[in-house]
Structures are given as structure tokens and as C-alpha cells.
């Protein structure tokens, strides 16, 4: 398999690189323990009730308040690794996760933390999110398809991570040794990052996972089993049919492809997938085992014909995904995998030859939250907002009107929600995501806001972010006050102009 990423593609990059360019980092409180006086970047927050909340972030920082955010104490986490996620099951029990397989557990309300061992310890994968389902049950997600479950308070963890099978699209790209592992039934983990897991506050048996490449999952048993969700773009095109041994497309097909490309031109999170097909007769006559190159040339020509129309319509090549491309170097695999060519031919077989053109969902997703068992929201890179009305089975896009990365969201209902993100983004909607705006009670900031969470009941909540920024609301998010830092003219200066689009 490809070399592991030292920091998972984009998520960790946004957590690590962006803050470094904006300020000097300090990791220890001035004067030792006690009230915070220095700015650790904060990535996540968990709110137990109107009094108790915990925030976590850079260099092993875990901060705790038990007076509704008036004062905060830096607790002993026993690590200097970055902590990306934190979740409390109740006032006493919770977990925090982070860099290099870090899993911490508390049983005293976050005052002290103990390291827990998982099956990922020797793999060094980054853990990006944790959801405490109960004092004994929790779910963790991270890079390389990491999906862990404990039902005994973290004494043991079940590894339910995403793996590759022989019919998985990534199988053909594995190294030969990894392919052999798959055939033997050994686990080879999928090269995908899962960024967030969350469960419904009122019933934590209903949970959801999201990640890169539009990976979506839902569970109705507290994370013991998962089912895939899907994004419905509403943009489709009929397959481009071609005759036997033909590569040219008709004027009508050209117009249809052009209209299809124009429909997604401004939606940068959508790519176009091109997948050529061949008939049984073509495979038999042109794809002979001792010389499959004539068939490869037909397949390649069909792909190029359609791709040229898409590019002429204004779609850059980096947004075009070529699936089922001819394996020109197939001879390198035959000795170790005698069925390689047969599998490829079977994957191209269709009744009517031609090319399938489809939407390839490619949003990089950061956070998922549900207001109830049906109404859910997802945020992502480039201002992506997704909505579900059926418990996460299907999702559709909503228009935020901004292009910043949206790191967090809190829904109060199916109509009302608040999102936070980079460059001080704090927006709200009261019409189910049809329109978004900066409400009158929102502060004007220029720092990165990472996470948002509210206490059960929804009145008291916090936003956390860069340089130990902590905002507090007591009125369901309508108005916010700065809890930490007490003053910072760089971060709190009023904007002279609207924030950059």
C-alpha cells in the first residue's frame, strides 16, 4: 500500500499548519497551574451541563471549567501530543483522542487522565474524534479507516476499521504483498480518513461518522454496526452509448456532456468520473489474453473523447476521475496475480459499449451533528454544508455563501443551527439552511474557530479555537461573550471591512 501519511491529508494540515503561520505558540500556563493566561490552540469542546465543560487541543492541553466558564483550569493530561477530540459521557467519565494513536480516559470529571491501549497502538494512526456513548461505551475514528469501539470503559477496544477486500476499488492499487494479505484474509486498512463521530444527545444509540471522499455512516446501536449513507447531487446524465468498435460521440451527446459539466462548474467539491465500457464481442475480438492492447486502445480513445468535451466545457483535469483505465503494464502483475487481466475485462463488460459519466462526490467533511433522529447537518472544506432529513440515509447540499473551511456545527432544531470555521467564521441559519448570516450577537473575529458544543437543553454553549479562544453563550447561541482570552486586540478588533469571501 502507499506510504502512510505523516499527517492525514487535509484535516491535520488545517489543524497544524494554519495556526503556525499566525502566532507564536506557548504551551504552559504562566505561573504554573491554575487559571489560564496563555493561548493554547483548542480543537474540541465537550459540555456536560451548564456548569461543567472541557476543551482540548495543542500540546496535550485539556482545560476544565466547573463554574460555567468563568474560570478554567489546565488539567494534567500526561501527554504533549495534540488532542483532536474530547467527549464526556457524564460529569465523571470521558475520553480524549489525538496524535499517534493517543487515547486518554478520565473517571474523575477530567481532573486526571490515564492512557488506554487500543489495537492501533503499534500503527501510530491519528485519532481525530471520539464519542462517549455511555460511561462504558465509546467510539473512536481516525485516519486509515480507523473505527474503534469499547463496551467496557476502554479496558478493551474492538477494531472495526475499514478494510479492503478483493472487489474493493483500492485493491488493484495495493502492493503485491498487500494483495496477498487480502487474499489470505489479513486486514489491510482502507486509505481514508474518518474525521468525526457524534451521537444524538437525547439518545446516544443513534450515531454518525463522516470523513474525506464523502464517507458517510450511520448507526442505531451505539456504534456496534454501521450502514452507509449517500449524497444526492441531483445532477445526472445518461450513459454515452457507442456502437461496436466506435469511439466518436454524437452532437447530442456532446451537448449533454457540456450541460452536465456546466452544472457543476462552480461546485468545487464535485468531480466528474469517466468510466469506459466494452461489449462482450469487443472483449472477445480485441481483448485477447495474449494481446489485449487493441481493446485497451479502444477504451482509452473513448475515455479521451469524453474527457476532451468535459475540459472544453471548463472543467480542469484535476477534477476528472478516470475509472477503469487500461492497465498497460498488466504483464508486471500476471505472474503474481494470474487472474488480474480477467478481472479487468469483467469490470469493463457491459451490454451496450460506451462511457458512463457520473458525479464523483469529493467533499472533505469535518463535522456531523443531528438535532433529532431525522434532522442532521454536516460541514466541510470550502463552505460545504450537507443536510439530511431521514436520519443520515441520504444527504443534499445547502448553500452557505462562504468558501471558508467549516470545522464545526451545532443544530438546535431542523431549522436552526450555528456553524464555525476559519477566519472567524460564525454563521447561523433559522430556515433550515436556505440562508446563512452573521447574527447581530455574533462577535467579529479573525481567528480560526474549531469546535462548538452546547449543554443538554441547548441554552449554554461554547465555541473554542485558536489561541485559547473560548466564547460562551447563555441564550441558545444568539449572543456570545469572550471568556478567554480576556483581551487580545489582534483577535478582537472590530472589522473595518467584511470578512474575505
Can you name each region flagged by the protein language model?
Residues 260, 266-270, 282-289, 301-363, ...:
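Periplasmic OmpA/Pal-like peptidoglycan-binding modules at the C-termini of bacterial envelope proteins
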Residues 22-235, 255, 259, 266, ...:
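Residue-level hotspots at or immediately adjacent to binding/recognition sites across diverse folds
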Residues 79, 253, 295-303, 402:
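Short, conserved glycine- and acidic-residue-centered signature motifs
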Residues 2-11:
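Bacterial N-terminal signal peptides that target proteins for export
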Residues 11-19:
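Bacterial N-terminal signal peptides
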Residues 100, 277-279, 325-327:
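Solvent-exposed coil/turn segments that connect beta secondary-structure elements
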Residues 232-268, 276-297, 351:
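Short, solvent-exposed beta-strand/turn patches at coil↔beta or beta↔helix junctions
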Amino acid at each position: 500500500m502507499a506510504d502512510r501519511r505523516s499527517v492525514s491529508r487535509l484535516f491535520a494540515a488545517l489543524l497544524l499548519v494554519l495556526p503556525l503561520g499566525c502566532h507564536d505558540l506557548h504551551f504552559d500556563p504562566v505561573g504554573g497551574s491554575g487559571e489560564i493566561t496563555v493561548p493554547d490552540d483548542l480543537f474540541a469542546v465537550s459540555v456536560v451541563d451548564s456548569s461543567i465543560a472541557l476543551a482540548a487541543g495543542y500540546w496535550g492541553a485539556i482545560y476544565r471549567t466547573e463554574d460555567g466558564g468563568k474560570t478554567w483550569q489546565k488539567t494534567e493530561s500526561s501527554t504533549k501530543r495534540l488532542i483532536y477530540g474530547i467527549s464526556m459521557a457524564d460529569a465523571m467519565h470521558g475520553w480524549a483522542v489525538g496524535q499517534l494513536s493517543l487515547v486518554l480516559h478520565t473517571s474523575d470529571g477530567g481532573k486526571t487522565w490515564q492512557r488506554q491501549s487500543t489495537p492501533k497502538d503499534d500503527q501510530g494512526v491519528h485519532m481525530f474524534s471520539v464519542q462517549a456513548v455511555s460511561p462504558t461505551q465509546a467510539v473512536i475514528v481516525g485516519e486509515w479507516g480507523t473505527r474503534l469501539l469499547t463496551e467496557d470503559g476502554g479496558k478493551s477496544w474492538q477494531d472495526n476499521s475499514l478494510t479492503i477486500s478483493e472487489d474493493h476499488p483500492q485493491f488493484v492499487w495495493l502492493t503485491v504483498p498487500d494483495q496477498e494479505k487480502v487474499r489470505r484474509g489479513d486486514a489491510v486498512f482502507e486509505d481514508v480518513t474518518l474525521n468525526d463521530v457524534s451521537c444524538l444527545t437525547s439518545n446516544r444509540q443513534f450515531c454518525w461518522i463522516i470523513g474525506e471522499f464523502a464517507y458517510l455512516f450511520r448507526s442505531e446501536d451505539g456504534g456496534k454496526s454501521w450502514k452507509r449513507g449517500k449524497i444526492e447531487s441531483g445532477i445526472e446524465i445518461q450513459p454515452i452509448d457507442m456502437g461496436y468498435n466506435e469511439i466518436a460521440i454524437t452532437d447530442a451527446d456532446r451537448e449533454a456532456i457540456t450541460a452536465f459539466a456546466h452544472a457543476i462548474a462552480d461546485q468545487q467539491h464535485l468531480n466528474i468520473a469517466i468510466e469506459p465500457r466494452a461489449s462482450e464481442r469487443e472483449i472477445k475480438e480485441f481483448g485477447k489474453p495474449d494481446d489485449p492492447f487493441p481493446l485497451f486502445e479502444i477504451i482509452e480513445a473513448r475515455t479521451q473523447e469524453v474527457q476532451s468535451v468535459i475540459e472544453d466545457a471548463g472543467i480542469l483535469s484535476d477534477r476528472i476521475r478516470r475509472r477503469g483505465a487500461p492497465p498497460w503494464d498488466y504483464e508486471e502483475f500476471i505472474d503474481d496475480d494470474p487472474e488480474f487481466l480477467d478481472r479487468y475485462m469483467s469490470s469493463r463488460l457491459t451490454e451496450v459499449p460506451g462511457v458512463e459519466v457520473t458525479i464523483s462526490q469529493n467533499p472533505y467533511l469535518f463535522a456531523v451533528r443531528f438535532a433529532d433522529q431525522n434532522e442532521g447537518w454536516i460541514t466541510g472544506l470550502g463552505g460545504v454544508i450537507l443536510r439530511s432529513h431521514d436520519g443520515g440515509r441520504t444527504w443534499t447540499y445547502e448553500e452557505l455563501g462562504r468558501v471558508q473551511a467549516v470545522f464545526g456545527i451545532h443544530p438546535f432544531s431542523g431549522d436552526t443551527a450555528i456553524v464555525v470555521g476559519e477566519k472567524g467564521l460564525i454563521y447561523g441559519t433559522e430556515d433550515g439552511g436556505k440562508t446563512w448570516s452573521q447574527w447581530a450577537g455574533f462577535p467579529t473575529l479573525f481567528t480560526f474557530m474549531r469546535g462548538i458544543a452546547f449543554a443538554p437543553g441547548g441554552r449554554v454553549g461554547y465555541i473554542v479555537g485558536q489561541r485559547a479562544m473560548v466564547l460562551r453563550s447563555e441564550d441558545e447561541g444568539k449572543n456570545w461573550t469572550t471568556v478567554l482570552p480576556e483581551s487580545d486586540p489582534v483577535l478582537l478588533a472590530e472589522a473595518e471591512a467584511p470578512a474575505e469571501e
